[in-house]
Amino acid sequence: KSGAIGKPVAVDATCTSLTEIGSDPDYFRKNWNSSCAWGPTALLPVFQILGTDYKDMRIASVFADEKKTFDRFSKFDFTFDCAVATVKVGSGVKSEGELIVSGTNGYVYVPAPWWKTDYFEVRYENATENKRYFYQLNGEGIRYEIVAFVKAVENGKMTDCVSQGISREICKVVSKRERTEIKA
């Protein structure tokens, strides 16, 4: 937001965990797939940085079950007017859980696990200009925003942590993944 990296042109967010995935059909009905478990967390920085007015979205998934109702891994690709974004989520799959925001003058690198990290780096072509910033996140990092949302629902009060527009768009994207699974 400060403009330190110039204009953002790409956001890449990855969230995965080596969660044990069962093979019993009841498991798939009772547990969150990767899009439900990690989608909201991974989508949040995309929509906070680039907004929600994307022109195209494509989803590719690897499924854990024969009925293709439980995505083990999904990749979401977004095209905006002047930017792109990629979100990768996985359950029972491991990847480097980093966040990278590419800009016209440099980029922001947040190391794995970026949703819990206590620092990030602003990096440039000339490495001597790179800076590391430290900050303290509450509890489990970005997940405190989700906890704040749950408390807001319980108390019947809106929260300022995440805008309604971003919340709606996250729900829409995850729902689209779910509707796609039902059709498969």
Model-derived features: positions:
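Predominantly a Rossmann-like dinucleotide-binding segment in NAD(P)-dependent oxidoreductases
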Residues: K1-R58
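Active-site rim elements
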Residues: W32-S34, Y133-Q136, G156-T159
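Contiguous beta-strand/loop segments that form the cofactor/metal-binding neighborhood of enzyme cores
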Residues: A37-K116, V147-K157
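A generic structural signal for residues located within well-ordered alpha-helices
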Residues: W38-T41, Y144, V162, I166
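Short polybasic amphipathic segments
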Residues: L99, T117-A127
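Surface-exposed loop/edge segments in extracytoplasmic proteins
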Residues: T128-R132
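Active-site loop of classical SDR/Rossmann-like NAD(P)-dependent oxidoreductases
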Residues: Y133-V147, V162
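C-terminal helix-rich "cap/oligomerization" subdomain common to oxidoreductases
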Residues: A148-A184
